[in-house]
């Protein structure tokens, strides 16, 4: 563990568990692991509060697929978890493009974010609004990346007395998130080389902005993120300190 931490310049405390005592206590021992992997835990995360109580846990059903630490922080604490990669000036709103990670590995789940800031008294329509143009984040397909469905925040209902309509809307500042999963196939692993590959993720944000008196023309704004995918770290520790 020290060999790994030194190579990756990890300076926070790490827990050694040579007999898998802690792993078993948390119920995450992988009973199917054999050989050098015997005693390993199933990879995942626990969110533990200051009193030692488990508040959340995150485990993926497939061993090679997992959410990144930054992506997890982005879900638990959105104000801490993303890095702004671009700011877009668009009609009737400000758009900040963020992502949990700039670098991933095969199997990583990366979170992309479109943070929308609307002026006072301006709203956009939420998914499900009838007769209007709801806001929609739409990404273009990218080979080797699986695009998960976009997630929208909770909307609220705006009542138009003149029309006797109730319509779901967003206003103020809100975030649309979309996870991207990197391919885990062996052929893709082999194609990455030493420095990996850079993938450009493009798409658009469609919306229709309105104020108290006017609904403006539907608008589409281009969006773009960049993700570098690097090969997994396969460097082994010296033989005399390897896990037996």
Regions found by a protein language model. Name each.
Residues 37-97:
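Thiol-/selenol-based redox modules, centered on thioredoxin-like
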Residues 1-42:
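Short, internal strand/loop/helix patches
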Residues 6, 27, 53, 77-81, ...:
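Sec-exported extracytoplasmic/periplasmic mature domains
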Residues 73-244:
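Extracellular/lumen-exposed scaffold segments
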Residues 17, 48-49, 212:
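Short, acidic, Ser/Thr-enriched surface-loop or helix-capping motifs
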Residues 19-20, 51, 142, 183:
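Solvent-exposed coil/turn segments that connect beta secondary-structure elements
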């Amino acid at each position: 563990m020290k060999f790994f931490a030194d190579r990756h310049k990890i300076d926070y405390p790490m827990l050694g568990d040579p007999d898998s005592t802690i792993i078993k206590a948390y119920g995450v021992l992988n009973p199917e692991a054999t050989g050098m992997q015997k005693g390993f835990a199933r990879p995942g995360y626990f969110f533990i509060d200051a009193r030692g109580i488990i508040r959340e846990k995150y485990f993926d059903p497939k061993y090679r697929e997992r959410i990144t630490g930054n992506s997890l922080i982005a879900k638990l604490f959105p104000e801490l978890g993303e890095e702004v990669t671009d700011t877009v000036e668009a009609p009737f709103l400000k758009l900040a493009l963020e992502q949990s990670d700039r670098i991933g590995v095969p199997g990583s789940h990366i979170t992309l974010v479109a943070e929308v800031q609307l002026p006072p008294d301006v709203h956009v329509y939420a998914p499900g609004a009838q007769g209007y143009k709801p806001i929609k984040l739409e990404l273009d397909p990218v080979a080797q990346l699986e695009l998960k469905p976009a997630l929208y925040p909770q909307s609220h209902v705006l009542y138009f007395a003149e029309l006797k309509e109730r319509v779901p809307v967003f206003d103020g500042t809100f975030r649309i998130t979309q996870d991207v999963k990197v391919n885990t196939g062996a052929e893709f692993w082999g194609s990455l080389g030493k420095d990996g590959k850079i993938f450009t993720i493009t798409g658009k944000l469609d919306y229709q902005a309105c104020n108290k008196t006017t609904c403006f023309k539907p608008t589409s704004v281009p969006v773009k993120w960049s993700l570098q995918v690097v090969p997994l770290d396969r460097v082994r520790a010296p033989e005399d300190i390897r896990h037996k």
